[in-house]
Amino acid sequence: MARYVIPYFEGVNESAGELAGNAAAARLARNVTTDYGRLASAAGASPYIEAPAPGGAQSLYVFCETDADGERTEYVVAGTDSAVCVFRDGQWKTLYTGTAGDWGFLSYKKEDDSILIFGNGVDPVQCWDGASETATALAGAPAKGKYFALHYERVWMCGDAENPDRLYYSRMLDPNDWTGDVVTPEMGGGFVDLPTFDGGVITNLYSVGGDLCILKSTTALLLYGTSPENYQVTRMSGELGTIAGRTAAVYGQTGYFVTAHGIGVQSGTTIVLLDDRKLPRLFDATFCEEENCAEGLSPHFGGCAAGICFRERLYFALPLGQETVNSIVLEYDLARETYVLHDEIAVRGFARSGLMRERLLALGADGKVYALGTENTAGAQWTTPWIDFGTSEEKVLRAFALYGRLESPGRRPCVRVTVESERGKKVRYLEALGPREKLYKRRFRLGGRRFRVDISAVSGTRFCFTGGLELETE
């Protein structure tokens, strides 16, 4: 007898092909976590607001208001296909009804006053003070807009359907005045035109590292400077943009967003693709042999994909195949450089909530708002690549062993382990035996030249395998 040990577990990595270069790197990792090399069920989602947002909810935002006494009130806001609603007094209330969707939001605070600014690029920009029953037009707004950012004490805005290449900025400390100032131009407002002459339009903007990044569908620009008299715009090297501007997320001094070929990374004046190629099934159309591969990123992702950064991880809600709505969430751990997928709920948008932004919320396709990272667990799966144990000769597997704990209602068989070769497969079940760690060893006999192992858990199961995976061969 010989033993083959996979000492720890990782996320998805198909960069080395289907045959194991690293057996710990999964072919598929769904609704699991591999933190610290352990394989565990991922925390799931539970309803945060059970009442569905009305009218085809598309986006989510959390607006916080703090009064003069320091009392903080948090409002969950949803953008629908034609309106913006807020949840308060136990129900959804309409703040504004427009003629289109795709809303953008920005919180602005001046002294003791907080306002929510929002727009869709078609209707007049609106603002809400957190107390009124409805929103009102933002006084002084020079145009329509749907992408907003705060940068050097000014509100920046773009996305006007009539001027798609124009970037507007307000006066310092005054979102209600966007006019220029002849006497002291450094205090005035104005606009900057950003044509690229290749058909690209602005898809989002964000402040990062003291500069302003403007994403376009075909490229990206960086605006730097502290006042109108020294603003300069440079085109970033890399020739990379995105049609999915809502996926933009910032961590530290770096911006991230989803493109058709992978995750874009913006650092300073350079934009590149995240150089790991671990997800060709999702981002490389030539990887799948089938036509219209259902596992690849949908070409329609620009109209629905969303992203956020939360606790050193990026979360991207994405559509697959030919879908026009999101069906999976891609999680990328920035510290460990690992990917896992989640499909418990179809997510339309994300938002952070709580005093320290410690809670991650998601807007589901059903219009409900969910809290992510709860005790609920979805069905989970982790699959190895093909393993040939270093030789193409015939081999026989005799057993596998996992060390850890399982918990499931009713102590029914809750984890299924499938060992497969080109000759067939063997299936064994593991029962929940309480919260204590235990050795789970199952015997079988299966011959072949190469093998792979699939570990699957039913919904509601909590598991954590801490000692890797051991295979016995002869």
Language model features by range: what are they?
Residues 83-88, 125-129, 165-186, 222, ...:
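Short beta-strand segments and strand-loop junctions that repeat across beta-rich extracellular domains
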Residues 89, 120-123, 129-132, 188, ...:
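Acidic/polar residues in short coil/turn loops that connect beta-strands
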Residues 113-117, 122-126, 152-156, 160, ...:
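A short, charged
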Residues 45-56, 96-103, 135-302:
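Beta-propeller and closely related beta-pinwheel folds
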Residues 106-138:
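Hydrophobic or amphipathic alpha-helical targeting/insertion segments
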Residues 1-96, 100-111, 239-254, 261, ...:
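Beta-sheet repeat architectures centered on beta-propellers
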Residues 92, 133, 228-229, 337:
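Short coil/turn linkers that define WD40 beta-propeller blade boundaries
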